[in-house]
């Protein structure tokens, strides 16, 4: 049981080192985001960039148009 808890903690520490933005509370410009989570920082919105083929797979935080 203790080894399972240790493993979960180790995975969490590795993830927080690799993906600091996901633990900062909000996502910065051009960070990957999920539209329904509203996780981009103030002034940014989660949009799917259009790469010409009309199918941008990754959603990113971009500046909101005024």
From Swiss-Prot:
Locations listed in the record: Secreted; Nematocyst
SS bonds (residue pairs): 26-41, 33-46, 40-61
Signal peptide: 1-24
Keyword Secreted tagged: yes
Alphabetical keyword list: Acetylcholine receptor inhibiting toxin, Cleavage on pair of basic residues, Disulfide bond, Knottin, Nematocyst, Neurotoxin, Postsynaptic neurotoxin, Secreted, Signal, Toxin
Gene Ontology MF, one: acetylcholine receptor inhibitor activity
Superkingdom assignment: Eukaryota
Cellular-component GO terms for this entry: extracellular region; host cell postsynaptic membrane; nematocyst
UniProt main location, coarse: secreted
Domain-level remarks: The presence of a 'disulfide through disulfide knot' structurally defines this protein as a knottin.
Protein role: Alpha-toxins act on postsynaptic membranes, they bind to the nicotinic acetylcholine receptors (nAChR) and thus inhibit them. This toxin competes with alpha-bungarotoxin for binding to orthosteric sites on muscle-type T.carlifornicus (IC(50)=1080 nM) and human alpha-7/CHRNA7 nAChRs (IC(50)=14.13 uM).
Other facts noted in the record for this chain: Negative results: does not show activity on rat TRPV1, human TRPV3, rat TRPA1 channels, the human ghrelin receptor, human neurotensin receptor 1, rat ASIC1a and ASIC3 channels.
The protein's name: Alpha-actitoxin-Ms11a-2
Lineage summary: Eukaryota, Metazoa, Cnidaria, Anthozoa, Hexacorallia
